[in-house]
Design a protein with these regions (language model features):
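Short, acidic, metal-binding catalytic loop of nucleotide-sugar glycosyltransferases
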Residues: 17-33
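Glycine-rich, basic loop-to-helix element that forms the pyrophosphate-binding segment
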Residues: 38-53
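Short beta-strand-to-loop acidic/aromatic patch adjacent to the donor-nucleotide binding site
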Residues: 56-67
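Acidic donor-binding/catalytic loop of UDP-sugar-dependent glycosyltransferases
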Residues: 66-77
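Short beta-strand-to-loop element that shapes/binds the nucleotide-sugar donor at the catalytic cleft/hinge
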Residues: 83-97
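A recurrent flexible, glycine/aromatic-enriched loop bordering the glycosyltransferase active site
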Residues: 101-120
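Acidic donor-binding loop at a coil-to-helix junction in glycosyltransferase catalytic cores
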Residues: 136-143
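Active-site donor/metal-binding and catalytic loop motifs
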Residues: 157-177
């Protein structure tokens, strides 16, 4: 199995941690890091990564300030087209309590209950070639919602495999201002 990891980056000091979390898994992979598109949302950089997807089995999106827990690749089951890696958010944020999405009591996929914490089968992506929209209110959900229009073969992991230590804290202050 080969995985393409698409990392949109602001070239933060946490990028190495993100990359190392991939390398620790000891799997065949491509790491596609893009930071040249300045749209303020990571959409353009994710799209640049998607343009380079060719020979993998799966695509995983990983923000440069996030990381993956060991064992995530074992969750990628070929019986599914989408695997949502349950995410821990805000564990290091002093202003908000940590939360898990999808919520443990609610594994349904909808805006606010999933972020960029999903893997998509490469063959499905190449058939449709969806892109992230910078004008979407929630670009990650907008992308995933379009995927879910063509497949119901989805899995949500029981355990947390995607960690976003600061959630939105490093992007927006508690006042809601940047």
């Amino acid at each position: 199995m080969k995985i393409d990891f698409i990392i949109p980056t602001l070239f933060r000091d946490t990028l190495d941690r993100a990359v190392n979390s991939i390398k620790k898994e000891n799997i065949d992979h491509n790491i596609l890091i893009h930071g040249d598109v300045k749209d303020g949302r990571g959409c353009g950089n994710r799209n640049e990564g998607l343009k380079k997807v060719i020979d993998s089995d799966w695509i995983i999106f990983l923000d440069d300030d996030d990381y993956l827990n060991e064992g995530f690749s074992k969750q990628l089951d070929n019986n599914y087209d989408v695997v949502v890696l349950r995410m821990s958010q805000d564990a290091s944020n002093p202003f908000y309590p940590p939360k898990v999405i999808p919520r443990t009591e609610d594994s349904r996929l909808y805006s606010g209950n999933v972020g960029c914490n999903f893997a998509i089968k490469t063959s499905l992506y190449l058939k449709h070639k969806w892109l992230f929209s910078v004008t979407a209110k929630n670009p990650d959900w907008d992308f995933l919602a379009r995927v879910l229009e063509v497949t119901n073969k989805t899995k949500v992991t029981d355990e947390i495999y995607y960690v976003a230590p600061m959630g939105g804290y490093n992007k927006v202050k508690p006042t809601g201002r940047k």
